[in-house]
Amino acid sequence: MEESPIKFADIDINEILKTLPHRNPFLLIDRVKNIRADYSGIGVKNVSFNEPCFQGHFPERPVYPGVLMIEGMAQTAGVIGIKSVEGTEKPRAVYFLTIDKCKFRKPVLPGQTIEYHMRSIGRRKTMWWFHGDAKVDGVVVAEADVGAMLTD
């Protein structure tokens, strides 16, 4: 199957800050790359030991929380959705609505980079559904289907 054309090659942190309302410590993606015309793209999260979550998860063996990976998927999907409709619609917010088929496969450790491979699996008016695979070094560490709503 032929890949659809790239609409946005690289969205850096400055552009993400203009696109999403999330801020530190709850902005959980560092950039989004390869947003395609088929509403797919890849979010990137560089996991640092300095993240607040590692103070309690877990002090003796730090593991990046799975729920934060799911939120990272949702934030990536939000950027893809908003950027995909820019110019035709002007959404001001995106709300995370559903999580389905969520699985955590391997732990993510400080120093690793997570890539959130998101692709649209459906859209109806302002509702979007995405399937996501979180990968570290090409290996799936988590997966889920997420739903979101773009609002004006």
Swiss-Prot record:
A GO molecular-function term, please?
(3R)-hydroxyacyl-[acyl-carrier-protein] dehydratase activity
> Which InterPro entries does the annotation name?
FabA_FabZ, FabZ, HotDog_dom_sf
SUPFAM superfamilies of this UniProt entry?
A: Thioesterase/thiol ester dehydrase-isomerase (SSF54637)
Query: Keywords, A to Z?
Result: Cytoplasm, Lipid A biosynthesis, Lipid biosynthesis, Lipid metabolism, Lyase
Q: Which reaction does it catalyse?
A: a (3R)-hydroxyacyl-[ACP] = a (2E)-enoyl-[ACP] + H2O
Offer a single GO CC term for the protein. Answer: membrane
Q: Where in the cell is it found?
A: Cytoplasm
Q: Which GO terms describe its biological process?
A: fatty acid biosynthetic process; lipid A biosynthetic process
The cross-references to Pfam families, in alphabetical order and at most eight, read:
FabA (PF07977)
Query: What superkingdom heads the lineage?
Result: Bacteria
Q: List, from the UniProt record, the residues annotated as the active site of this protein.
A: H57
Which EC numbers does the record give?
A: 4.2.1.59
Which family is it part of? Answer: Belongs to the thioester dehydratase family. FabZ subfamily.
Q: Which HAMAP family match?
A: FabZ
Q: What does this protein do?
A: Involved in unsaturated fatty acids biosynthesis. Catalyzes the dehydration of short chain beta-hydroxyacyl-ACPs and long chain saturated and unsaturated beta-hydroxyacyl-ACPs.
Q: What is this protein called?
A: 3-hydroxyacyl-[acyl-carrier-protein] dehydratase FabZ
Please name the source species: Bradyrhizobium sp. (strain ORS 278)
Q: Its gene?
A: fabZ
